[in-house]
Structure formats: structure tokens, C-alpha cells
Design a protein with these regions (language model features):
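Conserved N-terminal phosphate-binding loop of PLP-dependent enzymes in the Aspartate aminotransferase
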Residues: 1-240
Length: 240
């Protein structure tokens, strides 16, 4: 039985140590001293939430926004990735006054009802009931096991399916609210998107009046090597 964790390790009660390779999207390990200290310091001053204005909320938002391209200039502090994606969906629907979503096969965006509805990783697996009527799934842009495996032009070819999904929505007399995609497909197999995929997909969505959402829950905040945000590797700027 695991008793505690420290940095990249887990420890049993008898002191046996394990390298933790299964803890999902841990960023800086367990009980990182700087994180523990920052949490202790804040708890000793104010247990903050969004109902109260506190200088540290503003300072955090400013530091976060400094890592993003200029057009992305507003930050909301929420409790989880699921809540962040729920908020993104609400904003996209409010802005476009549409409901239909274009999503990627085997994508995962959270465990709330609305997030499961747009997560092929959930609704197409055991216990799932398939995509809801307002959700349109495009093929996973995987150049290793996917339908297009050549390096050149595969990004455009996969993105063309986004255009096809838009045309399907329009044929039903509706419009598209948004396209949501993990900047690196995480639960789908840690798949790096082919070059040009997001640029082409985003253009199709914007031409249709929709909003482009980059899900960076598992890939953002410095996890993508030279890029602080994984969408930067595709040379794009999302709307949300």
C-alpha cells in the first residue's frame, strides 16, 4: 500500500520505493518542496477562491498570460481541466449561438457530462453510447497507425475531414460552435499532430464562424519541450 510520495517516487509503509510512471499528468512530482511551501504560505494568509480578489490571483494570471501569444489576454482560474473545458464550451456556444462541436477521434477533454459528450475516448469505449447528435468526430490525425501515414500533406488531408464535418452540420441547417483538440493527443496515445494540421483545421472552423479551442490540460505549462504550450509547435493561436 502506497503511504506517501516525494518528487518522482512513491513509498510503501515499509520504505520500499517505486518510480511513479502511472500518475497521469503529474507535472513536478509529489510534494515538491517549493509547491508545498507556496501552499502553506497561502493557506496561512487566505484560502483563496474566485469570490475574493487577492493580489496573488492577479500576479498568477499576469505570469500565465506572459507565456501566451498576445491575442490570448484573459485568464480564468478554475479547479480542474474538466471545469476549464466546460467553461470553454460555454463561451464558444455563447459567442457563436451554436451548439454543434467538431471533435477528434479518441480525444479526451474531462469527466463532467458536457466533457464526456465531446470525448470520443469516453463515449466510443465500453459503457459509452456513441457521439451525441451535436458532436461530430473526425479521424485521429495519426501518421503511424491512422488512415494517412505519409509525412507530407497528411496534416492537410486529416484537416480536410474537419471541413467535411462542417459541411455535414450545414447540410442540417445548423452552424458550428467550435472545434476542440488536444495539441498533442494524450489519452489517444501521446500522438504528435502532423505538420500543418491545426493551421488547416482552424482555418476551416473560422471560415465557418466557429471557435478554435486548444485543450492544453495535459500538454501545457512547459510539458512540450521547447514550447510552453504545445499549440505553438503547430504555428497557430487558438481562440480559447
Amino acid at each position: 500500500m502506497v503511504q506517501r510520495g516525494y518528487m518522482q517516487y512513491l513509498y510503501e509503509a515499509d520504505g520500499r520505493k517505486y518510480l511513479d510512471t502511472v500518475n497521469n499528468v503529474a507535472h513536478v512530482g509529489h510534494e515538491h518542496p517549493r509547491i508545498v511551501r507556496a501552499g502553506q504560505d497561502q493557506m496561512a494568509v487566505l484560502n483563496t477562491n474566485t469570490r475574493y480578489l487577492h493580489k496573488n490571483i492577479v500576479a498568477f494570471a499576469e505570469k500565465l498570460l506572459a507565456t501566451l501569444p498576445g491575442p490570448l489576454s484573459v485568464a480564468y482560474v478554475v479547479n480542474s481541466g474538466s471545469e476549464a473545458n466546460e467553461l470553454a464550451l460555454r463561451m464558444a456556444k455563447a459567442y457563436t449561438r451554436q451548439k454543434d462541436m467538431v471533435v477528434v477521434e479518441v480525444g479526451y477533454h474531462g469527466n463532467t457530462n458536457a466533457c464526456v459528450d465531446i470525448s470520443s475516448y469516453k463515449f466510443d469505449r465500453k459503457g459509452g453510447t456513441g457521439a451525441p447528435g451535436h458532436v461530430h468526430v473526425v479521424p485521429i490525425p495519426d501518421t503511424y497507425r491512422g488512415i494517412y501515414r505519409e509525412k507530407e500533406e497528411s496534416g492537410k488531408r486529416y484537416a480536410f475531414h474537419v471541413k467535411e464535418a462542417i459541411e455535414k452540420v450545414r447540410s442540417q441547417g445548423k452552424g458550428v460552435a467550435a472545434f476542440i483538440c488536444e495539441s498533442i493527443l494524450s489519452c489517444g496515445g501521446q500522438i504528435v499532430l502532423p505538420e500543418g494540421y491545426l493551421k488547416e483545421a482552424y482555418q476551416h472552423i473560422r471560415n465557418a464562424g466557429g471557435v478554435c479551442i486548444a485543450d492544453e490540460v495535459q500538454t501545457g505549462c512547459g510539458r512540450a519541450g521547447d514550447y510552453f504550450w504545445a499549440f505553438e509547435s503547430q504555428g497557430v493561436v487558438p481562440d480559447i
